[in-house]
Amino acid sequence: MTTPAVKTGLFVGLNKGHVVTRRELAPRPNSRKGKTSKRTIFIRKLIREVAGMAPYEKRITELLKVGKDKRALKVAKRKLGTHKRAKRKREEMSSVLRKMRSLGGAAAAEKKM
């Protein structure tokens, strides 16, 4: 929604009404719904580092390695329940794979030295 136009002081027209200064209100708590906090992101990252991946996540990464994106999506959908969650999981796993490849290349270069 756009911000309403300034009132004109007239009692007719689109912007009719008494002229007042709008109060600046603090943001409501539910306006941040769906946004993960820095702490939550840190904790999830830490848990992922310690616990590793679930078996179905490992299978998805294996399917993505051989280029079977559609099969990976189907596996994720069956495990997670909805198409939207499955797509998000597939993207997450492919980004993990990309990071592993980029780090793997750097690690291989260090081993050669």
Swiss-Prot record:
Residues 78-113 are annotated as: Disordered. Keywords: Ribonucleoprotein, Ribosomal protein. GO terms for biological process: translation. It comes from the Eukaryota. GO terms for molecular function: structural constituent of ribosome. Pfam families: Ribosomal_L36e (PF01158). The keyword Ribonucleoprotein applies. InterPro entries: Ribosomal_eL36, Ribosomal_eL36_sf. One of its GO terms (cellular component) is cytosolic large ribosomal subunit. Residues 78-88 have a biased composition (Basic residues). PANTHER family: 60S RIBOSOMAL PROTEIN L36. Belongs to the eukaryotic ribosomal protein eL36 family. This is Large ribosomal subunit protein eL36z. It comes from Arabidopsis thaliana. The gene is RPL36A.
